[in-house]
Amino acid sequence: MTSTRKSVLTSSSTITVTTCLLLVGLAAAGYASEGGEGAHHVDTAKQMKDFAWRCLDFAVLLAIVVWALKKANVKGSLAERQSNIEKMLKEAVEAKEQAEKKFLEYNEKLEQANKEIEAMSAAMKQEGELEKVRIIAEAKAAAEKVKEQAQQAAHQEILKARIELRDEAARLAVEIAEKKIKENITKNDQDKLVGDYISKVVTLH
């Protein structure tokens, strides 16, 4: 849906710029032909009327440019991008919280395992020394394995969340940068068209 809206806005901006160019071209052609005739017929009333029509044409062109800028809905598009970034940040924070929650669960299991080891150690005091050492070693190895698995799982979850956040943030930053560049170019083109039109009006008078 976002890509479709972006295409519609781009097409609308292109059509608007093309229309403005056509209007400027037609106005310039009309002014050039009228300027040639004015060299042979000097009429103050006619010149004032011609000047009034040119001012009206300029006002119409300016209104079209303002309408096109409003139609593009630039602020709405940027607000939508910002909303998407905030949503991704929120999801990344939630993923991190889930990873930390799992890490705490693994720590609780580890503490429970340590308690069981202590209970086993107390029970084995009555058994032979060699057997006791062997069982304790196995229990410690199992506890270390659980701890290592818990740390790896939590680390992987956090790393995954960071990578997804970084990639999405980079992608959205590029899209926003491209959007801003396109908007600046469109605005400069429109400013140039208005400036050229004013220059032609001043030159003809």
UniProtKB/Swiss-Prot annotation:
One of its GO terms (molecular function) is proton-transporting ATP synthase activity, rotational mechanism. CDD domains: ATP-synt_Fo_b. The keyword Nucleotidyltransferase does not apply. The chain crosses the membrane at residues 51-69. It comes from the Bacteria. Keywords: ATP synthesis, Cell inner membrane, Cell membrane, CF(0), Hydrogen ion transport, Ion transport, Membrane, Transmembrane, Transmembrane helix, Transport. GO terms for cellular component: plasma membrane; proton-transporting ATP synthase complex. It is a single-pass membrane protein. The keyword Cell membrane applies. It is found in: Cell inner membrane. InterPro entries: ATP_synth_b/b'su_bac/chlpt. Its main location: membrane. F-type ATPases have 2 components, F(1) - the catalytic core - and F(0) - the membrane proton channel. F(1) has five subunits: alpha(3), beta(3), gamma(1), delta(1), epsilon(1). F(0) has three main subunits: a(1), b(2) and c(10-14). The alpha and beta chains form an alternating ring which encloses part of the gamma chain. F(1) is attached to F(0) by a central stalk formed by the gamma and epsilon chains, while a peripheral stalk is formed by the delta and b chains. PANTHER family: ATP SYNTHASE SUBUNIT B, CHLOROPLASTIC (PTHR34264:SF3). Belongs to the ATPase B chain family. F(1)F(0) ATP synthase produces ATP from ADP in the presence of a proton or sodium gradient. F-type ATPases consist of two structural domains, F(1) containing the extramembraneous catalytic core and F(0) containing the membrane proton channel, linked together by a central stalk and a peripheral stalk. During catalysis, ATP synthesis in the catalytic domain of F(1) is coupled via a rotary mechanism of the central stalk subunits to proton translocation. This is ATP synthase subunit b. It comes from Geotalea uraniireducens (strain Rf4) (Geobacter uraniireducens). The lineage of its organism: Bacteria, Pseudomonadati, Thermodesulfobacteriota, Desulfuromonadia, Geobacterales.
